[in-house]
Amino acid sequence: MGLCTSKPNSSNSDQTPARNSPLPASESVKPSSSSVNGEDQCVTTTNNEGKKSPFFPFYSPSPAHYFFSKKTPARSPATNSTNSTPKRFFKRPFPPPSPAKHIRAVLARRHGSVKPNSSAIPEGSEAEGGGVGLDKSFGFSKSFASKYELGDEVGRGHFGYTCAAKFKKGDNKGQQVAVKVIPKAKMTTAIAIEDVRREVKILRALSGHNNLPHFYDAYEDHDNVYIVMELCEGGELLDRILSRGGKYTEEDAKTVMIQILNVVAFCHLQGVVHRDLKPENFLFTSKEDTSQLKAIDFGLSDYVRPDERLNDIVGSAYYVAPEVLHRSYSTEADIWSVGVIVYILLCGSRPFWARTESGIFRAVLKADPSFDDPPWPLLSSEARDFVKRLLNKDPRKRLTAAQALSHPWIKDSNDAKVPMDILVFKLMRAYLRSSSLRKAALRALSKTLTVDELFYLREQFALLEPSKNGTISLENIKSALMKMATDAMKDSRIPEFLGQLSALQYRRMDFEEFCAAALSVHQLEALDRWEQHARCAYELFEKEGNRPIMIDELASELGLGPSVPVHAVLHDWLRHTDGKLSFLGFVKLLHGVSSRTIKAH
């Protein structure tokens, strides 16, 4: 939710929408003629440049997505760009793209009678009586009016608006806050009501992290819900990017990325996926260059278990991950969005661009970001590798937020601290369920890891606070997690997931075995040196773990049932000369046998 800090530009309020724009008149913006000290606020290079229209993010099933269609500070270079970064290059805006048809259908199903292509409804124009019969009582305090003095409106979206306010009394008397006002008349479906309820619950649970605005409380009366939060007065990250001519230096980009990754890692550890990360959804607390960055707009966020996949298509087109468009995603989708942000920070253009949303989606699914154009050849190889590993189209090969903070480009920065990573527990669960043969293969692979690759694993092992003899058990894991747990972690059922690590209840694991259990084969595969890793690991496996094995025995070790055509699936896993695992079989064993492999036969 955007905690906006400036009034809407009244000069645009009476302008008509751009042709074919799905936005209401009040939010379609023509080129501004205003200037500061005689200079145009927007950087222009041609007669057509400087025209800034609100970007229309693809349709969301949650009205909360539109609550904070932010109006940027009056002297910002992005004054007239209300909901998006402009065009491919940050100096050249373009008209809003058309919505994608299949996403219109999603919105239609979600909002019932509301037509998706007319969902951008100006405030106050919704039909009377929407949502009649729905229970719109949230159980929030009804004392908002007695505690706060509501001030000027500072931002407006399709389903709500934001006001500045201040405490009327108490120790905080006179202190300014941001209040997100959500009219209950806009809550026309049970899903919309539940979205608001979940947003408040998540904000309440996560509040307290350095890179999240402080959550004060939520209130309601007969007409509205009021969410009271810290007022961030430094403007959007988008504004800072534009004020710097469209890009950051590597060092400054690192400072921004560390803060973004810290809060994303925290959310993911708690089992919360944001689903709408973009420069507009990060605010600075003040105008100072060194001010803290805060993640906002949790209107689309949701709980997700480590072994769960979501299927709602939500977010903003330029930042959406490929797997979101495929309707099967988890926390990795947020990391893709972070990758798009850092790409923009370093070069000033978007990695995926088209003039229509369907074109953007095609680019996201099929195109590779360019690292050939300036300034990429002049940037460090570590910076390029960092961005590439966040923008891997295979979510299994993408870095997590904690791993990104362990990357050589970032890890030596003073503020970079590696947080606990929920991925470790997913990988440990798979390892504990593996056959003895696969465990031996993973142990061989773990012995080929480089110092940089081991850095992340050492940090994760240390966070589990091993005993004096250097081992961990299930109790170490539970204890370490509980120290960082919020109510969100309970709601995402992560403690329940840990029950699947019960094999550690009666045994302990040393660091060497932990490396085998917690390494990601898919992520190693994404490296240029993967072939070298695999060959070296196979040589070790030949000496320490490989043995003659019958196909039926191998099938049993892999847990394949009688319905699986094991000879068809596994025939090329074994060497015909001695019946031992071939190199191909070894690599496949590292991954295990997936249902996709079985179906292929």
From Swiss-Prot:
A lipid is attached at G2 (N-myristoyl glycine). Activated by calcium and calmodulin. Autophosphorylation may play an important role in the regulation of the kinase activity. The modification Phosphoserine is found at S316, S582. ATP binds at V154, G155, R156, G157, H158, F159, G160, Y161, T162, K180. Its EC number is 2.7.11.1. The lineage of its organism: Eukaryota, Viridiplantae, Streptophyta, Embryophyta, Tracheophyta. Ca(2+) 1 binds at S467, N469, T471, N476. Residues 434-454 are annotated as: Calmodulin binding (CaMBD). It is an enzyme of class 2 (transferase). Residues 415-445 are annotated as: Autoinhibitory domain. May play a role in signal transduction pathways that involve calcium as a second messenger. GO terms for cellular component: membrane. This is CDPK-related kinase 5. Keywords: ATP-binding, Calcium, Kinase, Lipoprotein, Membrane, Metal-binding, Myristate, Nucleotide-binding, Phosphoprotein, Repeat, Serine/threonine-protein kinase, Transferase. Residues 1-19, 36-48 have a biased composition (Polar residues). The gene is CRK5. It catalyses: L-seryl-[protein] + ATP = O-phospho-L-seryl-[protein] + ADP + H(+); L-threonyl-[protein] + ATP = O-phospho-L-threonyl-[protein] + ADP + H(+). Residues 26-35 have a biased composition (Low complexity). Ca(2+) 4 binds at D578, K580. PROSITE patterns: PROTEIN_KINASE_ATP, PROTEIN_KINASE_DOM, PROTEIN_KINASE_ST. Residues 452-488, 489-524, 525-564, 567-596 form the EF-hand domain. The keyword Flavoprotein does not apply. Ca(2+) 3 binds at N546, E553.
